[in-house]
Amino acid sequence: MSENTDSTHEKLIFAPSRYQYEKSSLHRDALMGKDPLVLFNQWFQEATDDEGIKSPESTTLSTARLPSGRVSSRLVLLKELDHRGFIIFTNLGTSKKAKDLKSNPYASLSFWWEPLQRQVRVEGIIERLSREETEEYFKTRPRNSRIGAWASPQSEVIADREELEKRVEEYKKKFGEDESVPVPVPDFWGGIRIVPLEIEFWQGGKYRLHDRFSFRRNTLDEDYELVRLAP
């Protein structure tokens, strides 16, 4: 028998699992009657307090464009949590996520806090923040970050980094460097809130028998139902 030399079947990565999850466990009785957003805040604070987690606010935002159904994901930063949901800020004009959300208002978030062996998944509907809410946050950004929001046509093709740096310099000249002179919010930039239909809390368990509990509802007007999911 001749040796198969087809490189398309060659393993580029082979990662047999050796890592065991043994930190903690989740029990239904401890979750019953809890507001999942309050529970998320509790987990987030524990992640923030863990010295091994440098950026607990990092989360993977996934969106899908219709009618193709093509999915795209990217790391973003959670900036706020309120009684309705999870808030991030972004370019809402040229970015891929903005184009996806124009055709499909559903999105998901995934938080992974490895030292705690915890994951939180969020599925929900996007709603845009008001101009006033966006302006309130925009003022907290460093001045150069505010200028960067104007300068970057996010996700558009550019020739090279020099083109981007040239745009930054142009907007620096336009707005000046006097901190007392505000940099306005671009019309194409703003905040979005992911209002949850489902929030899943995942705690790693021995032998991959993880604890998974989902707070879920079919519409935003309903109360959440708590269910356990098989790992």
From Swiss-Prot:
The keyword Flavoprotein applies. FMN binds at residues 74-77, 89-90, 96-97, 119, 154-155, 202, 212. GO terms for biological process: pyridoxamine metabolic process; pyridoxine biosynthetic process. Pathway: Cofactor metabolism; pyridoxal 5'-phosphate salvage; pyridoxal 5'-phosphate from pyridoxamine 5'-phosphate: step 1/1; Cofactor metabolism; pyridoxal 5'-phosphate salvage; pyridoxal 5'-phosphate from pyridoxine 5'-phosphate: step 1/1. InterPro entries: Pyridox_Oxase, Pyridox_Oxase_CS, Pyridox_Oxase_N, Pyridoxamine_oxidase_dimer_C, Split_barrel_FMN-bd. Transmembrane segments: none annotated. Gene3D superfamilies: Electron Transport, Fmn-binding Protein, Chain A (2.30.110.10). GO terms for molecular function: FMN binding; pyridoxamine phosphate oxidase activity. Its cofactor is FMN. Binds 1 FMN per subunit. Keywords: Flavoprotein, FMN, Oxidoreductase, Pyridoxine biosynthesis. It catalyses: pyridoxamine 5'-phosphate + O2 + H2O = pyridoxal 5'-phosphate + H2O2 + NH4(+); pyridoxine 5'-phosphate + O2 = pyridoxal 5'-phosphate + H2O2. Pyridoxal 5'-phosphate binds at residues 20-23, 79, 137, 141, 145, 208-210. Pfam families: PNP_phzG_C, PNPOx_N. Its EC number is 1.4.3.5. Catalyzes the oxidation of either pyridoxine 5'-phosphate (PNP) or pyridoxamine 5'-phosphate (PMP) into pyridoxal 5'-phosphate (PLP). Belongs to the pyridoxamine 5'-phosphate oxidase family. NCBIfam families: pdxH (TIGR00558), PRK05679.1 (NF004231). Homodimer. This is Probable pyridoxamine 5'-phosphate oxidase. The lineage of its organism: Eukaryota, Fungi, Dikarya, Ascomycota, Taphrinomycotina.
